[in-house]
Every structure is written in C-alpha cells, then in structure tokens.
A protein has these predicted regions:
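Hydrophobic pocket/interface hotspot
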Residues: 17-21, 27, 52, 66, ...
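A conserved amphipathic terminal alpha-helix motif
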Residues: 106, 112-146
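Mid-chain, well-packed structural core segment of small domains
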Residues: 79-93
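Hydrophobic ligand-binding cavity/cleft-lining segments
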Residues: 1-44
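A short, structured loop/turn motif at beta-sheet edges
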Residues: 14-15, 68-73, 96-106
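Hydrophobic/aromatic beta-strand elements that line small-molecule binding cavities or substrate pockets
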Residues: 6-8, 62-68, 90-98
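Glycine-centered tight beta-turn/hairpin loop motif at sheet-sheet or coil-to-beta transitions
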Residues: 1, 57-59, 85-87
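Short beta-strand segments that buttress and anchor functional surface loops
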Residues: 50-57, 77-83
Length: 146
C-alpha cells in the first residue's frame, strides 16, 4: 500500500480555512491544478456519495466520490473513481486542526492507494504529496497572506 502525505500551517483561523475548502465542488476555486469542477447528477455537493468531475489545467479529467464530510471535525474524505494518475484503490482525507497559538490552522492531506503499475509507486507518492497536496496548501497559504 502506497502513502502520500503533506501538512502545512496556514495563517488563518480554522473557520476561514474550512469555509474556503469545505465546498466539495469548489476545488477549482483554490487549487491551482484544477480548472473546473462539477457535481454529477445534480446532487448537493456536501452529500456523501456525490461525485465531482474535475478538469485539470492540462485537460486531464478525474472523477472523485465524497465518502465522508464533517463540519464538526473539519475534514472530508474521498475516493478517486477514475483519472490519469497511476493509482487504484485511492482514498484521501483533507483535515484541518485548530492551532490556538496565533489562531492558525494545521492542515493535513493524506492518501493511501495501490500504485498501478507497482513500479510507479515512488513517483506517484512524490507527485501526490508535493504537486497535489502541497501545491494546494501553498495556494491556501498565499490566499490567506502566508
């Protein structure tokens, strides 16, 4: 089982960061790698089971299904159903935690998956951890002035 992980401190209160990332259909509003997002079938974007269709900046497409969302816990989990990444059985969680010192937010994004093909595991772990997860955190930090 392969793993990807990134974490970051964002200089904004957890409520503001959660408000920015909570909209499951809003990834294109804050992640630089995403050009467009739509929810399939007209379902509410916070309904567990809804599927978002993402168009990447390079034209690639990914379909992801919402598995869990918690406003109280400030996190959501999702699975990739299909896309260009060399992965299978992909499950990820984006989680925020309150930092009381300075009223900041600790953000953590992690995933487990099977590399497909297996020899692409290190490459997939690096790309997901750095380009996808850390790339999103860098954009959030810039948005919040960090």
């Amino acid at each position: 089982m392969a793993r990807a992980h990134a974490s970051s401190v964002i200089n904004a209160p957890i409520e503001k960061v959660w408000n920015r990332i909570r909209e499951y259909n809003g990834l294109a509003d804050w992640h630089p790698g995403i050009a467009k997002s739509t929810i399939e079938g007209g379902k509410p974007s916070d309904q567990v089971g809804c599927v978002r269709a993402l168009t990447l900046q390079d034209g690639g497409r990914i379909r992801e299904q919402l598995l869990e969302m918690s406003d109280l816990g400030h996190h959501y989990s999702y699975a990739i159903l299909e896309g260009p990444l060399p992965v299978a059985n992909y499950r990820a969680t984006l989680r925020l935690r309150r930092i009381s010192d300075g009223n900041r937010t600790y953000a953590e994004w992690s995933a487990t998956f099977d590399a497909d093909p297996p020899e692409k595991q290190a490459e997939a772990e690096d790309f997901i951890s750095n380009a996808v997860f850390q790339g999103g955190f860098d954009a959030l930090k810039k948005h919040f002035g960090g």
